[in-house]
Amino acid sequence: MEEKRMNEAESLELITSMINDSRARMTKNLGTPFLIWGYTTVAVSICQAVIVACVEEFYPYLWGWFAIPVVGWLLMLLFNKQEKTVTNYIDRCINALWCAIGVAAFILPFMGVFVFPSVIMLIGVGTATTAAVVKDKIVKRIGYAAIFSSLLFPFVRLLLSRLFTLEQFAGRERYLVECIIFAVIMFLLLVVSGRILNYKKRCLKS
């Protein structure tokens, strides 16, 4: 009976140690992926806004959004080569979560859904979940705030439909406004979160 209790205690201690080890390692390396995807997304969003403002036929340039996964994955490959670490079950679960979110975000444009708020909700869920694992309350709140901020898009569309006629605020102008809102939210969600995580990493080192 005592041996069984010891085995249970050892198992619990092993699980706790694994979680703490994952938390420490993830906190060490977590900020940079947020910055990579954040800056890439914001840069592409700004480019899209500029193209919409300057080009008459902007629809062919919508394929430019796929620069986000291409550039993001290339930069992540470079980052992972430099930061070779041993992973455990917790790490693999978080990686699987973000891979699933990435695949879902990639498929969304082909499904005819409202892409901007849907992507923000997905990234917000991933951010809040990851922050919960590493016990970062600020980043967790940012993730939840981003999820709720996705409601801005239908609200803005409703507001603009009341203030302007369809001719005054056609697809081009509405898309331009939504690109800007998307860029701002993604900057706050990913770039600010990445900066916070990197700042805490530097504090732990010192």
Q: What residue ranges belong to the model's regions?
A:
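N-terminal juxtamembrane cytosolic/stromal segments of multi-pass membrane proteins
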Residues: M1-L30
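Membrane-proximal helix-loop-helix units in multi-pass membrane proteins
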Residues: N88-L151
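Membrane-embedded alpha-helical segments of small multi-pass membrane proteins
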Residues: V42-I46, V50, V71-L74, F110, ...
